[in-house]
Amino acid sequence: MIARTWHGTVRAEEAAAYLSYLNGTGVVDLQATEGNRGVYVLRRVDGERAEFLMISLWRDLEDIRAFAGEDVERARYYPEDEAFLFELVPRVTHYEVLVRPEIQDGVGERGGGDDAE
């Protein structure tokens, strides 16, 4: 499996609007592409900026190519991205997935599980 990472930064006051836009564009397109194994969208607010990190999981490079085009390292943007983002970062990064989590409901969550106090 391959992880494709992209990052971008917006004004903190526009973070919710950008997330909604991202969910309606990039996330939907990623999920609709054959070979996509999942998408994570992470956000970190730091003062007046909100940083987004998107991690998409893929079966192989051919599946990524179906989404991204021949140059799989080139970031893919949508029409309104320029209005939100401080910078259109031109490249994405790919990683080979070596270990993946087995997520269990309530385990390791604060306030979750039987051992919560």
Indicate residue ranges for each PLM-predicted region.
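Glycine-rich beta-strand-turn "strand-cap" elements at beta-sheet edges
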Residues: Y40-A50, R76-E117
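Short, surface-exposed ligand-recognition loops at beta-strand->loop->(often short) alpha-helix junctions
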Residues: T9-L22
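Short hydrophobic/aromatic beta-strand micro-patches
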Residues: T9, L42, I55-L57
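Non-catalytic surface loops within mature trypsin-like serine protease
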Residues: A12, D60, E96-V99
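Active-site-flanking beta-strand signature of metal-NTP-handling nucleotidyl enzymes
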Residues: I2-G8
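Short, glycine- and small/hydrophobic-rich beta-strand elements in well-ordered beta-sheets
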Residues: V27-L53
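An amphipathic, aromatic/His-enriched active-site/gating alpha helix that lines ligand/cofactor pockets
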Residues: Y21-N36, L57-T93
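Amphipathic alpha-helical recognition patches that constitute DNA-binding helices
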Residues: T5, A17, L53
